[in-house]
Amino acid sequence: MITRSRSGERGQTIVLVALSIVSLLAMGALAIDVVTLYTARSEIQRAADAAALAGAKAFVDSGSTSDPNNASLQTLARSMGTAFINAILAENKVGGVPPVLLGTPVYDFTTHPGNPLITITLKRTDLPIFFARIWSRAAPTVTAVARAEAYNASNSQANTGNFIPIAPKCVKPFLVPNLDPNRGGAPYILLPNGAVAPGFSVGEGPTWWHDPCNPGGGSTCGPPIVPPPSPPSTGDYYFPAQVTRNASNLCPSCKGSSDFEQSIECCDFNAYSCGGNVPNASIDLTLTGNTFRQDIHQGLQCLINMPSQDTLDASYFPSGPMQITANSGPQSGKLVSTSSSIVTLPIFDNTTLNTATGQVTVIGFLQAFVWDVNGASGQVQMSILNVVGCGNNPGAGSPVSGGGISPIPVRLVHD
């Protein structure tokens, strides 16, 4: 047998192993870069979505959806929206650094009048990478686009011929008639299409609202009169709604025992339907005596943290936003953008009220700020922030919720 020397091939295995290790390390490093870019892409899209929703909230807070032709409110919405976006960007970092706006937010009040849109583009440059630089020395950049809208059902039927229903939760059990006490009993909502009636002004009040009990005063409140006597010289009446106990309700520690009081204090998860021509709620004709006014007084005191309730300053409005100052909790003494004093109340069609059964048709919602409550008389002092109407021709599809709490939900829009 002939034996050949392989001395020239000695050490090649070590070289191959070394090259393999280097290749594996390079692939691992590239994988890290890919994950970094993928994570940054996800983070910037989340940041863009959050910023767009914050900007859309300005449409609600400014009142521009309730008065869609008011140029001053549109200007205010732009200013508030940009401020909200800049504030939230600092809290939504991409790769450890806040993203920046690419250009300026685009505010669209004309495509769907009364249901405005906002579009923003975010950018994050100079992302940290390692081995990926062998293909390009330029630091990678990620961008994201997000669009959101504030949906006020008042404008839906006028825009499209039918309205997309809303089904808000955490609605307080005070049914208010479609009569604006600040405009001599003119309607809040036009019945044919659910649009907000001309002449309504965002920020009306503060106005005292009265319970509809039989005359007598003090604790001698009997069954509510349906309809009540002529409206008082100032303010109007509210009616107690029938409520259903719900174990899922979110309640504060000060909650009471009755279902009616708890529905005032808690976030009541029983959703209200709105619109159409069929009765969908009822006035509670069984609440009597001192218990009724006690429930109202104690319920609202608990809800708004009396005597340390939040305050509303509308002196800058509409050139500047209404300012809410917290007077309790960790934010006490500071300006806040939300408050437990902001409530949603159902509006009913007083022209179709069934006086025998108390059945009513909810045709919209009021968003109001509660200032005070008088336990002896059942009076509640409120300022009106927004009005939402529902038409009589509901369209197909699921109700718009946007989180389920606000009567004017904000939501992301995807083309």
What are these regions (language model features)?
Residues 66-82, 86, 104-119, 132-415:
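N-linked glycosylation sequons
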